[in-house]
């Protein structure tokens, strides 16, 4: 056994289960198997076994003949999951995914996909909701990345935890990939398993840095059929660069935080922050690094590169997540100063990081990006034009429904092929609703910030149009609302005015003419 691998596997019983050739484990997989992977937002995912299975399919022309029902906490690795999608190896997938081949498979009907709130996915697994057509509530195999195995057989995850504890609990067979290409993450995790009702008790987390579990995942050694060494790290890409739009949105939010502090609705160090993924999220965290706010705390799903400078500035005191999804440069920075960051970061299972009880208790400030939002503050996070799936709901609704402050941020327009302005992200009616009008407090674009707290639907519509819509679309949206309000009031139905015949006219015009700038209502 290589010395580096032996130093990571400190349990003699597990050391006997090392398999030097991943291909030797391929026969354990059968068509139609229920398979679970570790991983969340493209880090901490298994590499060697998925690649061995892909090679087996490719070399033996088994495309479409060896397919799996694949369960991952969120997205797996692009180098593995996309390859499986290209080879038609995924029959069913949930609850969240990233990658053009996967999206193509879903929208062509080849992959049966369903998204789910990320806090609920692991518990629904344990309830047996996704295995109800099987004789037992189990999955066939879980493939889990680890960075170490402790003396008493505990599995130390890597850059993410996700749903690994629940997948291991349900698996009939477990394969562990010990990744020696990255440092051991031992001590960075707080693992707790929540029992099913009626045996639940309150989750005793009152601060972002509270520890209530163990630094490893417990595993039944009898389930482990093999341990392989992974020889390369997580393959990630550079983060989306900030631009004028994202910086303007960040500026509006920082100004808003200043105002909330000045009137006493927020403390000077705000409340624990949750931030999604993308250039807007990066700009907001970057903006906080240059603000006077300090002693900040984070309770979120995913940590990105921009959190590292916030730590370095000593403005960020502590951060909890279920994943550290850094770029290659970000991981290099993280590893080079690992001892410093290790004392300030804690990774938890997604059932804890996204748990409504904790989010509400801590009073989190949730910030996420939708595909579109309508004038009444319903938001679509998943389906373009109501039907084309992007990635899935993720954890945005876990946070937005339960946060003290629920914020959605989006550009007012997105680029399009035919219209120089682009398509409007503020529409009369959202073509799909993931977050309802009851979930959002603040909507912000580069044009401005709409504070929707305590407003009626008609008041919200005026606020959203005036503050958030792009100037090229503002007159059209105002005209729609005015016509709808007059029409609905005249028939005694004016609470949330809509004209159903026209509500999707801008989207239909986009499909027919390539622009959302209609000639008339």
Curated annotation (Swiss-Prot):
GO-annotated cellular components: cytosol; mitochondrion
Organism: Schizosaccharomyces pombe (strain 972 / ATCC 24843) (Fission yeast)
Lineage, uppermost ranks: Eukaryota, Fungi, Dikarya, Ascomycota, Taphrinomycotina
Gene3D superfamilies, A to Z: 4-hydroxybutyrate coenzyme like domains (3.30.750.70), Acetyl-CoA hydrolase/transferase C-terminal domain (3.40.1080.20), Glutaconate Coenzyme A-transferase (3.40.1080.10)
UniProt-annotated location(s): Cytoplasm
Biological-process GO terms, alphabetical: acetate metabolic process; acetyl-CoA biosynthetic process from acetate; fatty acid biosynthetic process
Chief place of localization: cytoplasm
Catalytic activity: acetyl-CoA + H2O = acetate + CoA + H(+)
PANTHER family named among the record's database cross-references: ACETYL-COA HYDROLASE
UniProt-recorded name of the protein: Acetyl-CoA hydrolase
List of residues binding CoA: 276-280, 391, 395
EC class: hydrolase
Family: Belongs to the acetyl-CoA hydrolase/transferase family.
GO molecular function, one term: acetyl-CoA hydrolase activity
Keywords: Cytoplasm, Hydrolase
């Amino acid at each position: 056994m290589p010395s580096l691998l032996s130093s990571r596997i400190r349990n003699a019983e597990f050391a006997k289960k090392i398999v030097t050739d991943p291909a030797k484990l391929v026969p354990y997989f059968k068509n139609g198997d229920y398979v679970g992977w570790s991983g969340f937002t493209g880090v901490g995912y298994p590499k060697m076994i998925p690649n061995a299975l892909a090679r087996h399919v490719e070399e033996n022309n088994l495309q479409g003949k060896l397919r799996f029902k694949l369960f991952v906490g969120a997205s797996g690795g692009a180098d593995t999951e996309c390859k499986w999608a290209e080879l038609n190896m995924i029959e069913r997938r949930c609850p969240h995914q990233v990658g053009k081949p996967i999206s193509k498979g879903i929208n062509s009907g080849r992959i049966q996909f369903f998204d789910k709130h990320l806090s609920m996915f692991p518990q629904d697994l344990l309830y047996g909701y996704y295995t109800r057509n099987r004789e037992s509530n189990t999955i066939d195999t879980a493939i889990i990345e680890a960075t170490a195995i402790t003396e008493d057989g505990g599995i130390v995850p890597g850059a993410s935890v996700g749903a690994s504890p629940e997948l291991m609990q349900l698996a009939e067979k477990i394969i562990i990939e010990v990744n020696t290409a990255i440092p051991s993450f031992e001590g960075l995790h707080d693992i707790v398993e929540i029992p099913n009702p009626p045996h639940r008790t309150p989750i005793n987390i009152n601060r972002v840095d509270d520890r209530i579990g163990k630094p490893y995942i417990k595993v039944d050694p009898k389930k482990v059929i093999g341990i392989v060494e992974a020889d390369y790290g997580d393959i990630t890409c550079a983060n989306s660069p900030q631009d004028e739009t994202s910086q303007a949105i960040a500026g509006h939010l920082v100004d808003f935080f200043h105002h909330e502090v000045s009137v006493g609705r927020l403390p000077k160090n705000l409340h624990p922050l949750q931030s999604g993924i993308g250039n807007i999220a990066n700009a907001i965290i970057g903006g906080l690094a240059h603000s006077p706010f300090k002693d900040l705390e984070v309770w979120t799903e995913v940590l990105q590169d921009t959190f590292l400078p916030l730590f370095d500035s000593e403005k960020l005191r502590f951060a909890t997540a279920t994943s550290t999804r850094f770029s290659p440069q970000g991981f290099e920075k993280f590893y080079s100063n690992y001892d410093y960051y290790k004392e300030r970061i804690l990774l938890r299972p997604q059932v804890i990081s996204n748990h409504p009880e904790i989010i509400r208790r801590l009073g989190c400030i949730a910030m996420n990006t939708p595909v579109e939002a309508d004038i009444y503050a319903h938001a679509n996070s998943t389906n373009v034009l109501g039907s084309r799936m992007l990635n899935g709901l993720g954890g945005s609704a876990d946070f937005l429904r339960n946060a003290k402050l629920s914020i959605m941020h989006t550009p007012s327009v997105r680029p399009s092929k035919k219209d120089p302005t682009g398509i409007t992200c503020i529409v009369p009616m959202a073509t799909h609703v993931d977050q309802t009008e009851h979930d959002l407090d603040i909507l912000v674009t580069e044009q401005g910030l709409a504070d929707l707290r305590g407003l009626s639907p008609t008041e919200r519509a005026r606020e959203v149009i005036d503050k958030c819509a792009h100037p090229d679309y503002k007159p059209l949206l105002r005209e729609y609302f005015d016509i709808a309000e007059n029409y609905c009031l005249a028939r005694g139905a004016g609470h949330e005015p809509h004209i159903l015949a026209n509500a999707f006219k801008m989207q239909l015009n986009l499909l027919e003419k390539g622009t959302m700038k209609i000639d008339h209502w």
